[in-house]
UniProtKB/Swiss-Prot annotation:
Expressed by the venom gland. It comes from Androctonus amoreuxi (African fattail scorpion). Residues 21-85 form the LCN-type CS-alpha/beta domain. This is Toxin Aam3. It is found in: Secreted.
Length: 86
């Protein structure tokens, strides 16, 4: 039984774990992508970056911005509390 657990853990580490998170997709300078409600722009942008879906949502301090669901870790998201540096 212990061997089965050890082999399972070894396979998990060898294969790797892909994680995803939800958030406002951001440009490299921590600026959000602005959007128009009910337009397909956010969903398209999010899906192009590996998310499962996206929508236009309100973010205090930034206005309307694209919110992505299940965005990969390698895609930047808005860091709340940090300013957009243009």
């Amino acid at each position: 039984m212990n061997y089965l657990v050890m082999i399972s853990l070894a396979l998990l580490f060898m294969i790797g774990v892909e994680s995803a998170r939800d958030g406002y997709i951001a440009q490299p300078n921590n600026c959000v992508y602005h959007c128009i409600p009910l337009s397909p722009g956010c969903d398209k942008l999010c899906r192009e970056n590996g998310a499962t879906s996206g929508k236009c949502s309100f973010l205090a301090g930034s206005g309307l911005a694209c919110w992505c669901v299940a965005l990969p870790d390698n895609v930047p998201i808005k860091i709340i509390g940090q300013k957009c540096t243009r």
